[in-house]
Amino acid sequence: MKSIHGGDIYNNKVNMDFSVNINPLGIPHSVKEAMSDALSYADRYPDMACSGLKKAISEYFTQQGCSIQSEDVIPGNGASELFMAIAHAIKPKKAVLLAPGFFGYEYVLRAVGCDIGYFLLDEQSDFSPAARLDALMDMLTDDTDIFFIANPNNPTGYLADSTFMKQIIGHCKEKHIYVVADECFMGFCEKNYSVLSLLCDYDNLIVVRAFTKLFAIPGVRLGYMLSKNEAVRQNVQRNLPEWNVSVLAQMAGEACIRAVSYTHLRAHET
């Protein structure tokens, strides 16, 4: 299979892979311990519902002031599996992507035969989509089905503020466009511009996060999707295989949620 991400370390000698942006400070000790403990449970199937992990995620965000229930959470085998499930669940005919941007969105949209329009970001404005807000809104027309946006952007690192994100999500709701907000790098940001607080008001909003980056566990494969739209959640769940999140991944995820002090410290240091 042709490599589409990373430095292809399994076929090449790579000393420093700058294409994989994970926490250089490594895996928290408590998460390592949880993964080690998980081996004792490897002789059984994992909890198909991921009940403990969903509960931990919902309780964490509720403590942060966001009204997230366990049923709003769908864990997956990394964010990439969730992006693919979202594409198959919604079956968009036309999508808009920011460029430069994460290739994974194009990959899943091509898999469902979706036409893609690219909104080109300008280096002179630090790749800010907000600098050309009107032009972006003009591109997000009634015949658009889905819009993917990473915040902060991968690979540019641009962090859009809450005002811009709310404007875009609101515009897309009027046009009946789903917005997939990829917040996989939000944990590194001292300013929290997450759109999680908007979930209750915007049923077109889907948020995807992962434990990969901040906790330096890309090999574990663990991400999660959040949405208040029950129909969307049901369709996404139907497009995921059973037991898609291993025992090790579930226990690692719960340990990551418990390591709140680690995340705050590492976000500041990195």
Regions found by a protein language model. Name each.
Residues 50-54, 69-93, 223:
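Conserved beta-loop-alpha segment that forms the PLP phosphate-binding cup at the N-terminus of a helix
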Residues 67-73, 94, 143, 176, ...:
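Short acidic capping loops at alpha-helix termini that bridge into adjacent secondary structure
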